[in-house]
A protein has these predicted regions:
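Flexible "cap/lid" subdomain of the alpha/beta-hydrolase fold that forms the substrate-access gate
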Residues: 1-3, 14, 22, 28, ...
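A short loop-to-beta-strand scaffold at the N-terminal edge of the catalytic core in hydrolase folds
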Residues: 9-19
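Structural cue for short, hydrophobic secondary-structure segments
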Residues: 31-34, 58
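Serine-hydrolase catalytic-loop signature spanning alpha/beta hydrolases and amidase-signature enzymes
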Residues: 36-44, 56
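Short, well-ordered alpha-helices that flank and scaffold nucleotide-derived cofactor binding pockets
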Residues: 44-47, 51, 116-117
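Conserved alpha/beta-hydrolase
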Residues: 48-70
Length: 222
């Protein structure tokens, strides 16, 4: 696996991982990681796919890993439309006009939007661990805000994990956690894995705070 930085792409210096076993590969696969992950997450899959003759590219997305913003970031830069543009512009700079997309977790969301916004570029789309329900509506955003308030009203209080990770204190809490960052991340990924015995999927009866409180604590935090 080779690594490189592609400079001046939609305001970013993009760090990518790349594999290719053929001089003139017929197909490119772009792999987009989720949260909290990096392009490194795809290292084994990239090698497997490259042995099948595919040219594989996995970037660290905006805000992750070794990818750096050229100027100070604005919150608006992280809109789903701009995150999709990041990848489109990256592939355009690499002179790759058509490609397969594989997205995992939040990378699935970005991949789905790329497919909607730039369908002329997409050969195929594969998404994992995050179903795509279509473009978000304002009503859905308002509903999420209501759910977060209802979670706070529960006893004990709860927080949705996305709400927590976007709060001001989250970074400091994680970086300075009692067990150390490495052990925190190892535990976090283990608790979300198939190997963890208490992970038993079930369907929620409704989109309400009381139902969501039944979810594992790495999703709905006490």
């Amino acid at each position: 696996i080779k690594t490189k930085v592609i400079k001046n792409v939609n305001g970013l210096n993009f760090f990518i991982r790349e594999t290719c076993t053929e001089k003139k590969p017929s197909n490119t696969i772009v792999l987009l990681h989720g949260f909290p992950e990096l392009s490194y997450s795809f290292r084994f899959l990239m090698i497997l796919l490259s042995k099948q003759g595919y040219h594989c590219i996995a970037p660290d997305q905006r805000g992750y890993g070794e990818t750096r913003s050229i100027k100070k970031e604005k919150t608006s830069n992280f809109s789903i439309v701009n995150l999709s543009k990041d990848i489109f512009e990256l592939l355009k700079k690499l002179k790759i006009n058509k490609y397969h997309l594989i997205g995992h977790d939040f990378g699935s969301y970005v991949s789905s939007y790329i497919t909607l916004l730039y369908p002329q570029c997409i050969i195929s789309l594969t998404i994992m661990s995050m179903p795509f329900g279509g473009p978000s509506k304002k009503a859905n955003i308002n509903k999420l805000a209501t759910i977060n308030q209802e979670l706070r009203n529960l006893k004990p209080k709860r927080k949705h994990y996305q709400y927590y990770f976007s709060s001001k204190g989250a970074e400091s809490n994680i970086m300075n956690c009692r067990q150390g960052l490495k052990n925190f991340l190892r535990s976090y990924f283990h608790f979300k894995s198939y190997d963890y015995p208490h992970n038993k999927p079930f369907k929620l009866a409704s989109f309400t705070a009381s139902e969501m409180a039944k979810m594992p604590e790495y999703y709905i935090i006490k």
